[in-house]
């Protein structure tokens, strides 16, 4: 028996809107959440059109052969940065006219493996034994509205397609929010002060991998209580909530406790490592994870919030270095503010997506970016700025005041690029949560 996908009705409405475009073929991503019992699809986003898509077409290629899997994969990478913990790219969809339906499955197979590879390329965490390895492909005939849903095991390159059920839901899917502020203080040694940005980014990733192990081993308290990893998040489930067609948003607060080596009787050793410079990431990260409210498990909530922390650290560092490679730093001895995280609600749901902003960007820039990448219109008053801009200070003031409360900003002006530069969405802004800023600093040893 194949997997079953419970699909929010907004997805069906979105497909109806795409049909009206009357295009020969449209590709896009399916976003949602896997679980051991059910899979949930909550959102879909079509692939942005390349500006040069109508130029320099190779002769003899069909519409399906013109689909650029690399472009679709780049879109998946950008979408991945906008997903909080618990949500992920479940797979891909392809809408075609009847005459192109015959070869649709071949294209979908190619796309689903390419998208998965791109989505996981730079992630700090790895899948565990509880993760679902199947990804979904969906073909929609724009004329007959017929849907063909299949899954592939992304751990097996020779995987054969399996049939799956695609079930639209009339009621609103209910979600539980796991909310957390995590103080981060990570120092990463660099072997040489003359490293290129690419080499420095690689060194930082290696340093973050070691820190990732600490996060994965940490204990998470939910609403101040320790709960068994394999148990239910709530001891009692309200029977009335199952039959209700309306969701009531629930928020659980999480707290991280670092594991002590004395607890598990492991020996702690000091590591001596020569270095010419170091990089420090300090501040408080605002993290959120979402899990479906149908008998939520402790391990699911723990996984969602931990992966959100790891993802947002990695994404912000990548965005900062992308910006440095494009524009160059004003002074590498200064603290560089990491991007500001902004949460964006999904209409009709208590789910939220996220995005990152430069210091000189406005909410209009964020709205344009969301429309381009997620194909979603966002109202300005709906934006959730849980991380606020901090006041900048001069270098001499930082000597007498806590470094984590003041940052040095970069003077370059930046604007969002067009869809042809999806991978160059550098986003840099000073951020603060509870008066504590997120900074990244370089220190050089003479």
UniProtKB/Swiss-Prot annotation:
Keywords for this protein: Membrane, Transmembrane, Transmembrane helix
Functional summary from the UniProt entry: May play a role in the trafficking of a subset of G-protein coupled receptors.
Family: Belongs to the ODR-4 family.
Pfam families assigned: ODR4-like
Subcellular location: Membrane
InterPro entries, sorted: ODR-4-like
Compositional bias (Basic and acidic residues): 394-415
Species whose genome carries this gene: Xenopus laevis
Membrane topology: Multi-pass membrane protein
Transmembrane regions listed in the UniProt entry: 76-96, 426-446
UniProt entry tagged with the keyword Ribosomal protein: no
Protein name, entry field: Protein odr-4 homolog
GO cellular component, one term: membrane
A GO biological-process term: protein localization
Transmembrane listed as a keyword: yes
Domain of life from the UniProt record: Eukaryota
Region Disordered, residue ranges: 394-417
């Amino acid at each position: 028996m194949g997997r079953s996908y419970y699909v929010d009705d907004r997805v069906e409405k979105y497909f109806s809107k795409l049909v009206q475009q009357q295009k020969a073929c449209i590709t896009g991503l399916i976003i949602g959440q896997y679980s051991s019992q059910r899979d949930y699809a909550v959102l879909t986003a079509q692939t942005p059109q390349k500006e040069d898509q109508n130029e320099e077409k190779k002769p003899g290629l069909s519409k399906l052969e013109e689909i650029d899997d690399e472009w679709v994969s780049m879109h998946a990478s950008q979408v991945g940065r906008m997903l909080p913990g618990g949500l992920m790219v479940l797979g891909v969809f392809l809408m075609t006219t009847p005459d192109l339906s015959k070869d649709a499955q071949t294209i979908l197979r190619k796309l689903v493996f390419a998208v998965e590879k791109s989505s996981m390329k730079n992630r700090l965490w790895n899948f565990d034994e509880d993760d679902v390895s199947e990804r979904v492909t969906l073909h929609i005939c724009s004329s007959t509205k017929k849907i063909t849903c299949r899954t592939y095991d992304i751990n097996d390159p020779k995987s054969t397609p399996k049939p799956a059920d695609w079930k639209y839901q009339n009621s609103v899917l209910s979600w539980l929010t796991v909310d957390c502020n995590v103080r981060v203080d990570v120092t990463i040694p660099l072997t040489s002060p003359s490293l290129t940005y690419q080499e420095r980014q690689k060194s930082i990733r290696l340093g973050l991998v070691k820190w990732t192990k600490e996060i994965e081993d940490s204990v998470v308290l939910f609403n101040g209580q320790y709960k068994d990893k394999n148990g239910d998040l709530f001891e009692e489930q309200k029977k009335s909530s199952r039959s209700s067609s309306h969701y009531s948003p629930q928020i659980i607060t999480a707290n991280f406790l670092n594991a002590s080596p004395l607890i598990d009787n492991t020996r702690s050793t000091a590591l001596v490592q020569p270095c010419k410079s170091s990089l420090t990431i300090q501040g408080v990260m605002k993290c959120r994870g979402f899990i479906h409210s149908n008998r939520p498990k402790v391990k699911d909530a723990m996984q969602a919030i931990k992966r959100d922390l790891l993802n947002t650290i990695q994404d912000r560092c990548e965005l900062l270095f992308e910006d440095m490679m494009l524009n160059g730093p004003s002074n590498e001895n200064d603290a560089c503010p990491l991007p500001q995280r902004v949460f964006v609600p999904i209409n009709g749901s208590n789910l939220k997506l996220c995005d990152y902003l430069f210091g000189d960007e406005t909410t209009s820039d964020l709205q344009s970016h969301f429309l381009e990448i997620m194909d979603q219109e966002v109202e300005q008053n709906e934006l959730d700025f849980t991380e606020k801009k901090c006041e900048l200070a001069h270098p001499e003031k930082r000597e007498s005041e806590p470094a984590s409360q003041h940052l040095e900003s970069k003077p370059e002006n930046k604007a969002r690029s067009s869809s042809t530069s999806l991978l160059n969405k550098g986003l840099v802004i000073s951020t603060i949560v509870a008066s504590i800023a997120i900074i990244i600093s370089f220190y050089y040893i003479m």
